[in-house]
């Protein structure tokens, strides 16, 4: 009947979450610095988010060391994911795919590697679950995209793309042109 009962578990989750976030930012900053010879604040912040996403699946099962490892690897995965999307010429201006998809997959699988019930069986459960959820999401998205495409299309015209969607949709720019060199 007491609200404070079990707060030790809450504090543990808070600590593992904060450690993973810090390690994600640090991992992304160091890795992107080594890779690009440049420290980029957006890569650092996406690394923090990658660390947070990575630890979410197992924050209750990890100790501080595991949280730091999962967060740092999550941050590095974000940097590699951004590079992969750039190489594939896929547009993701805020890095949502590397942060949420790639670091999320890592965090889900990491439960099977580092969690309280880690082991081969748990790893396989995490891997299979990730595949099942991924397949469901891909199939659902394709169905929705096909419906939207048949009703109104999925792309804007090249002219609208060049002008910028803020200008076309809202008749003004949400960012001044000096922000992006226009």
Label every model-predicted segment.
Residues 33-42, 87-92:
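Membrane-helix interface "capping/anchor" motifs
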Residues 9, 13, 118-135:
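Structural signal for the N-terminal portions of transmembrane helices
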Residues 1-11, 172, 177-182:
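Single conserved hydrophobic/aromatic residue that forms the stacking wall/gate
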Residues 150-173:
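Extramembrane terminal tails and long inter-domain/linker segments of multi-pass membrane proteins
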Residues 5, 9, 56-65:
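Helix-coil boundary and interhelical linker segments in multi-pass alpha-helical membrane proteins
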Residues 39-48, 95-98:
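Cytoplasmic-side transmembrane-helix entry/capping segments in multi-pass membrane proteins
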Residues 20-33, 48-55, 59, 71-83, ...:
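Transmembrane alpha-helical segments of multi-pass membrane transport proteins and ion-pumping complexes
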Residues 12-21, 65-73:
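Structural signature of hydrophobic alpha-helical transmembrane segments
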